């Protein structure tokens, strides 16, 4: 597989479309990147944190659906009912809990807290000028193809855009960390390439567990530095192709949330974390 990809690249065609998830996976563990994105291994196993986060994202996507945007208000009970329905609908037997002190009820309550914090801030009218949710964009950075999915994109006035990203993790970013974050910088570049009039783009992180937000606006120089950082990350991955030694495992605490132990050369047997009840 690696040799085939390397041969395609040597002919001047890139077989790879990068995403933030891919760049993050390679940085955290090159072997995880290889197993998922080169070998094509996909599993139904997921962490309870990831499951909860997906359901919260789906509720907020539903909240800003075209049907709901024309309503004068949305009740919190409506949000909770949607969350409950999605939780039950998508629950499966391969959800795992790394922290054995916690159970599924604990993470369910965190999901409800995330929605409560968001509702308290923006409800019940939710009258933001939403362009779309789950915006799937393709774009290029340097010689690399990229794809990004934006949680929500607003256009409060012509030429002015706001990229929104929902986070259900427990650690919020500082403004300085947000300024150096490549994920939303990636999305800013995507918006600039895919929409006509773009005069200003602000990037907003919603840290739903604690109900806080961070918003940044990049200067052209700041964005250019992040663009070069993205190119460097993509170049590094491409330069590794064709040599197995470049995709060694990187063991860390993140291994507890990885379900590729049976494929990983650093592990023996499946991940021993418990299944959620």
Provide a role label for each language-model segment.
Residues 48, 52, 107, 180-183, ...:
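Hydrophobic (often cysteine-bearing) scaffold residues that line and stabilize catalytic clefts
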Residues 23-24, 28-68, 108, 112, ...:
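Nuclease catalytic cores
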Residues 128-130, 135-228, 232:
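Mg2+/Mn2+-dependent nuclease catalytic core
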Residues 30-43, 90-95, 163, 169, ...:
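Short amphipathic alpha-helical segments and their helix-coil junctions
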Residues 1-18, 136:
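Long, acidic, intrinsically disordered low-complexity segments
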Residues 1, 17, 77, 158, ...:
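Metal-dependent nuclease catalytic regions and adjoining charged, substrate-binding loops involved
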Residues 27-34, 54-57, 74-95, 198-208:
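Short, compositionally biased low-complexity segments
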Residues 59-133:
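A non-catalytic, helix-rich entry segment at domain boundaries
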């Amino acid at each position: 597989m690696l040799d085939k990809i390397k041969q395609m690249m040597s002919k001047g065609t890139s077989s790879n479309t990068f995403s933030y998830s891919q760049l993050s996976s390679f940085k955290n563990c090159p072997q995880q990147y290889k197993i998922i994105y080169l070998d094509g291994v996909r599993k139904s196993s997921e962490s309870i944190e990831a499951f909860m986060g997906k359901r919260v994202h789906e509720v907020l996507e539903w909240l800003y659906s075209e049907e709901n945007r024309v309503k004068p208000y949305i009740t919190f009970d409506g949000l909770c009912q949607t969350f409950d329905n999605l939780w039950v609908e998508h629950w499966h037997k391969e959800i795992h809990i790394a922290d054995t002190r916690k159970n599924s009820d604990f993470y369910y309550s965190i999901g409800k807290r995330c929605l409560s914090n968001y509702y308290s801030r923006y409800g019940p009218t939710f009258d933001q000028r939403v362009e779309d949710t789950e915006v799937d964009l393709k774009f290029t950075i340097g010689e690399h193809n990229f794809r990004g999915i934006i949680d929500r994109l607003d256009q409060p006035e012509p030429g002015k855009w706001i990229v929104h990203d929902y986070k259900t993790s427990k650690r919020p970013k500082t403004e300085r960390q947000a300024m150096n974050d490549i994920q939303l910088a990636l999305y800013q570049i995507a918006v600039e390439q895919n929409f006509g009039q773009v005069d200003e783009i602000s990037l907003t992180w919603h840290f739903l567990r604690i109900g806080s937000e961070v918003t940044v606006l990049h200067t052209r120089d700041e964005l250019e530095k992040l663009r070069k950082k993205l190119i460097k990350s993509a170049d590094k991955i491409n330069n590794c192709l064709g040599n197995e030694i470049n995709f060694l495992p990187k063991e860390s605490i993140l291994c507890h949330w990885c379900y590729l132990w049976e494929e990983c050369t650093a592990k023996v047997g499946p991940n021993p974390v418990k299944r959620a009840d």
